Amino acid sequence: DLNLDLGTLSKEETLKLVSIGDVLIHEYTYQMLENNLLSARSLDDKIGVYICTEVLRRVKEMKIDKGVYFVATVGEETTGRGAKFATTYVTPTCAIALDVGSGTDVNYRDNFTHEVKLGNGPILTIASHANQILTRKIINSAKKLNINLQPAVEIARTYTDMDNIYLEEKGIPSQLISIPLRYMHSSVEVCSLKDVEEIIELLVDLIKNMDENDTFNPFEEYKWLKKEYINTLKA
């Protein structure tokens, strides 16, 4: 069977647009679908490049005085060499990998134990090698902006540039934010422009609220907690 995705949310909405016997042809440019969905080839990861350039543009317009580096890497699916080289060259205080994650809200994918819906917000990785302090900062920004985050639990690897970034130098505090995507690695990938805009807003707010005194070292945080705990006991 050939699955036709128009971006509609119900049978009634679909039948207003197509009917049995309609002729279909391949569309080789991008196509806007219903409910603010975008279909195009290579959204993995051209949509990530767009998000990063738009974040940089807004950060500049807002005159946010922070050092922000954007890298479009090569070799993410193979050796990770682009991410390794860039991380060593820049040595960032922290890093966020931006990739895509498989959407499960299609009628032929019912073998998932979790849900990732297009238009329901960015995917935030929950993993042992995702820096917990950076994770909390992202969650706090999302709450402030009323942006829903869809958690994705990863064990050992995420199969993205994050797996290489966090191992460089003395260890780079890292996280992974993903854009929900249907039909990954096909010529008709689909994403939600609502999710795209929310990720842009989330990253801009995160950058704006970064401070040069911020620590992403969990051991430093534990020292502070231990001190507070001891002071509480003395009191």
Predicted feature descriptions by range:
Residues D1-A235:
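N-terminal hydrophobic/helix-forming segments and targeting peptides
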